[in-house]
C-alpha cells in the first residue's frame, strides 16, 4: 500500500436551492480527478449555504436526496473517497452533515456538533446538533472530520485529542470578514498543535444575498500555512500527504497572493457578480452623481459584470455644479459604460407647483432637497422596471449607520456594494 494519500481540495461556488447545478459541480470534479484518493467538498455543497427555510421543506429534502444518490451511483466508477456536505435526516431529525462516499456506499457520516447562532447564522433553528466525534480511516490514514464552527469550539475538537489522528479535515461555509482569513489560519495552526496532525481547510466560495464566501482554502501544520488557494475563485488543488513523514507535497500550480485590500475588493466584486448572475438580472443601473461613492460602485460593477452590463444615469438639477457633471461624464468615458442624462428640473417644478398651496408661508428646507432625491429614485426605478436592470444604491456604512439617507430616494435599489464599507474605506 502506498504511503501517499492524494487529496483534492474542491473550492466550489454552489447556488442555494439550485440542487441540479450543485450536483453537476460535484460530478464534474469527481469525473475529472480520478487520481485523487480523497476529494473534499465544502459544507452543505449540495443544498448551498445558508439554505435557511428551504431546507425545512420536504420537497427540497427529497431533491437533495435524489441528487446525492446520483453522486453515490457515479462513485461506483471511482476509486476516490468523496466528502460531501449535505442536509441529512436521521431519526426524524435534520442535521448539517458531512458524508464520506466510496464505491457507491456511505462509508462514513458526521453530524455537526456545534451549531452557530449569531450574526448571519441561525443553524439552531434549522438543524439538530450531533454529539459524536468523527474519525475514519483511508489507506491507513486516520482522519478527524469537522464541519466549520466545530473547530472554533474547544469542547468539540477535544473529543479527538489523543486519538492518534494522522490528518484533520474541516469542511466550511465561512463568510468573509476583513482580516478573517488570518484568524482562520491561526486557528488551524493551533488546532494542529493540539491534535498533533496537519489540517486541511476547505471553504465555500461565492456570493449569496448579502453574504460573501471568500474560499481561501488552505493546508496548515503546527507551525505555518503550507499552501493557500486563492480568495474569490472557484478552483481545486491536488496535494499529496505522506503519513510516515507527516509531510505534504504540492503541485507546481502557482496561486497569486493578494494583499488584504485586494482580497477585500475581490469580495466586493464577487458578491455583486453572484447576486446579479444568480438572480438572472441582465445588468445594473447606477445613479452617477460625480461623487466618490457612486464612482466606486460603478468601478466594482464594471469589474464584476463588464462595462456592457452597467448603465449610468446622471440626474442633474439647477443646483448641480458643472464640476459634478464633468466628473460623472469622465467616469462613464473611463469605464466605457453607457451614460444617460435625465434632468430632474421639470419634475421638481411639477412637485413644487402641486405642493405650492400646502407649503404656502413656509421656508424651503430639507423637504425640497428630499423631493429631489426621491425624483432620482423614481427615475432609476422606472428604468429598472422597463429594462430589468437592477438599481444599485450607493450608501456606505458610515451613512447607513446614522441614517444619513432619504427614504424612497437614494435608498431605492436592490443592492449596495459598499453598504459594509465605512466612508474612510471607500
Question: What annotation goes with each model-predicted range?
Answer:
Residues 64-68, 316, 415-423:
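Short, acidic/small-residue loops that bind anionic groups at enzyme active sites
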Residues 112-116, 121-131, 139-140, 162, ...:
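Active-site adenylate/phosphate-handling loop in enzymes that bind or generate adenylated species
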Residues 290-302, 355, 409:
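Short glycine/threonine-rich loop-to-helix capping motif typified by GTGT followed
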Amino acid at each position: 500500500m502506498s504511503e501517499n494519500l492524494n487529496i483534492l481540495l474542491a473550492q466550489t461556488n454552489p447556488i442555494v436551492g439550485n440542487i441540479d447545478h450543485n450536483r453537476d459541480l460535484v460530478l464534474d470534479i469527481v469525473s475529472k480527478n480520478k487520481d485523487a484518493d480523497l476529494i473534499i467538498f465544502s459544507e452543505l455543497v449540495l443544498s448551498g449555504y445558508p439554505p435557511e427555510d428551504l431546507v425545512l421543506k420536504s420537497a427540497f429534502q427529497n431533491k437533495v436526496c435524489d441528487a446525492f444518490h446520483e453522486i453515490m451511483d457515479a462513485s461506483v466508477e471511482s476509486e476516490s473517497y468523496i466528502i460531501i456536505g449535505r442536509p441529512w435526516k436521521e431519526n426524524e431529525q435534520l442535521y448539517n452533515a458531512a458524508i464520506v462516499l466510496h464505491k457507491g456506499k456511505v462509508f462514513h457520516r458526521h453530524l455537526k456538533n456545534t451549531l452557530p447562532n449569531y450574526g448571519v447564522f441561525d443553524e439552531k433553528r434549522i438543524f439538530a446538533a450531533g454529539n459524536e466525534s468523527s474519525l475514519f480511516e483511508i489507506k491507513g490514514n486516520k482522519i478527524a472530520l469537522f464541519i466549520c464552527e466545530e473547530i472554533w469550539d474547544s469542547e468539540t475538537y477535544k473529543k479527538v485529542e489523543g486519538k492518534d489522528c494522522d490528518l484533520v479535515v474541516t469542511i466550511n461555509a465561512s463568510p468573509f470578514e476583513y482580516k478573517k482569513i488570518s484568524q482562520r489560519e491561526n486557528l488551524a495552526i493551533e488546532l494542529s498543535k493540539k491534535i498533533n496532525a496537519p489540517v486541511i481547510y476547505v471553504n465555500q466560495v461565492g456570493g449569496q444575498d448579502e453574504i460573501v464566501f471568500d474560499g481561501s482554502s488552505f493546508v496548515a501544520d503546527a507551525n505555518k500555512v503550507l499552501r493557500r488557494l486563492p480568495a474569490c475563485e472557484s478552483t481545486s488543488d491536488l496535494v499529496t500527504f505522506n503519513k510516515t513523514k507527516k509531510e505534504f507535497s504540492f503541485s507546481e500550480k502557482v496561486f497569486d497572493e493578494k494583499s488584504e485590500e485586494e482580497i477585500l475588493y475581490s469580495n466586493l466584486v464577487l458578491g455583486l457578480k453572484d447576486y446579479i448572475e444568480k438572480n438572472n438580472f441582465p445588468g445594473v443601473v447606477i445613479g452617477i452623481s460625480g461623487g466618490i461613492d457612486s464612482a466606486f460602485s460603478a468601478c466594482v460593477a464594471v469589474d464584476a459584470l463588464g462595462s456592457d452590463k452597467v448603465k449610468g444615469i446622471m440626474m442633474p438639477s439647477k443646483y448641480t455644479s458643472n464640476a459634478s457633471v464633468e466628473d460623472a461624464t469622465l467616469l462613464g468615458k473611463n469605464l466605457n459604460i453607457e451614460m444617460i442624462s435625465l434632468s430632474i428640473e421639470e419634475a421638481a417644478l411639477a412637485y413644487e407647483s402641486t405642493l405650492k398651496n400646502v407649503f404656502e408661508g413656509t421656508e424651503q428646507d430639507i423637504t425640497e432637497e428630499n423631493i429631489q432625491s426621491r425624483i432620482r429614485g423614481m427615475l432609476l426605478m422606472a428604468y429598472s422596471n422597463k429594462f430589468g436592470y437592477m438599481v444599485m444604491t450607493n450608501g456606505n456604512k458610515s451613512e447607513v449607520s446614522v441614517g444619513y439617507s432619504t427614504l424612497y430616494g437614494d435608498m431605492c435599489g436592490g443592492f449596495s456594494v459598499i453598504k459594509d464599507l465605512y466612508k474612510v474605506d471607500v
